[in-house]
Amino acid sequence: MNNLLSCKQTIKMKNKFNLSLIAVLMAGTSALTSCSKDNDDVEEPIVDVAVEAKLSDSFFDKVAYKGAMGTVDWTTGWTSFTPNANVYGATTETLGPGIITANRTLDASKVYLLSGFVYVASGVTLTIPAGTVIRGDQASKATLVVVRGGKLIAEGTATNPIVFTSNKAVGQRGNGDWGGIILLGKSTNNNPGGVGKIEGGIDAAQADHGGKDVADNSGILKYVRIEFPGIAYVQDNEINGLTLGSVGSGTTLDYIQVSNSGDDSFEWFGGTVNAKHLISINNVDDIFDFDNGFSGRLQFVIGQRSPVFADAAGQSNGIESDNSNTEFSSTPRTRPVISNMTIIGPSTPGSVVDVKHQNANLWRKGSKMVLANSIFIGAKWGIDIRDVETGAALTDGTSLIKNNIYQVADATKEVIVSNNSFATADLLRTYLTTNGNTFIAEAAAGALLTTPYTLIATPNFTLATGSAAATGATF
């Protein structure tokens, strides 16, 4: 099969047969692997249609339990649930503002001040060793941007994570103290022409994301904490904790915590990147936000909400997923495939919840989805399905919501529909219960996990003894 594909050919698949064929080609063609290079000036095989993600894919660990963890706590050692109390050294070297134009490795013995917008140029790799601390400057809205073709290698360990945090003193830190991290790749999106400009006020010349390489590699983020990011550059043009623009599946995202983001914790604008072991605490806006044709896979992800942090200018949801703001059926369609997610709050027993908190899940503007084996407890409202194209994907089977557990503070809004193929909330509820989703009371929710409601201290998201979520996951 060596002559089946040259490095300069582009595969453009139009139907299910070809999607299957491409999987064979990618697995069995030595020409594809032999010509894979990191440098932009070397031709690479480009695949511009992703094989549709499924729960049966090898990416997913086929665990028996629902929710983000069983009896083993994968947050131990590298996370922090009290970031405002963490003592970090004074900064010893300034990074930025400007463009990094040559490969660079930081020094873990130094504490860096990230100043202004720092861009990792195309063809350049920024390497951050385990244990490095980088503190973001608020006045300059410090933000690290990896442009298309650039790479960030930030690989900590379970006992020595990399930390991006505020430059303010202990006790003085708050949501949105600095910008965040932005990765821009060459994978697909549904913007006109397949190229978008990332939001957040970054230099327009550096803001492009998108292309045709679904396997594009923007680097590695592993055992990384991002604390107090998420600044509003201008209204409705914010920087999130971790922003991902058309990032490809060659990128590694694993063991990443975003704490106290002033906007979304994680937001995807197109792309095909997969991720495991993500955790968000105490953010203001949406926890997980999908847009513009994102079609990657997620497993073992956690979001814990505070009752008091919410988006004053809009609404705060656990999941918020849109296909496109202008053309709801534009392709590629937004279609995250998610298993083993846990979202807790904002409602905790006895709490008063900010009025801007809304849904556990908001699916709208033509978004598709596969959501399975997950736990949502303490949301103000439950599942909100909006718009004809969104509902139609559930009824025609191209979307799926199955085997999830929901506990909602307002029982009258467990299920919400508007302008879609489910004429009433009862019809959507029938779909959900038929597919193994359950709605439970607050007392039952409290028996699922060990100590999930703990705020400003270390919670325990493992399954409680005798938990109803210990079995029942299906892939």
Model region roles, listed by residue range:
Residues I134-R135:
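Primarily the HKD phosphodiesterase
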Residues L5-L21:
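Bacterial N-terminal signal peptides that target proteins for export
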Residues V42-K110, L114-A121, A139-G149, G156, ...:
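Extracellular beta-rich repeat passengers
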Residues S36-N39:
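Bacterial signal peptide processing site
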